[in-house]
């Protein structure tokens, strides 16, 4: 039985891929990339032959990028939180070299949110 890591898509990255990837071949490659990212064995061995998953250098929060297709340049940005994978963005082929600019343009997706403070009996009178 294959063990998988769940993928969370709070930002609609899967929907964006379906809408914006220009060919059926890239849509299939996107699904194959998600399959590899879910594969616990790839995480255990830290080998991602299809997506070449790697950490983005130069941003304060840990952000990772994975290839949808190396030739076309389409990339998936993701982060780990509590051992879970959270999809953050789908990067268009022509823009994949501008990685930090792409992250900064949507920085609210990448910044860790501080836990909400409890309202238990601490109200001002």
Where in the sequence are the language-model features?
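Basic, Lys/Arg-enriched alpha-helical interface segments
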Residues: 1-74, 80-125
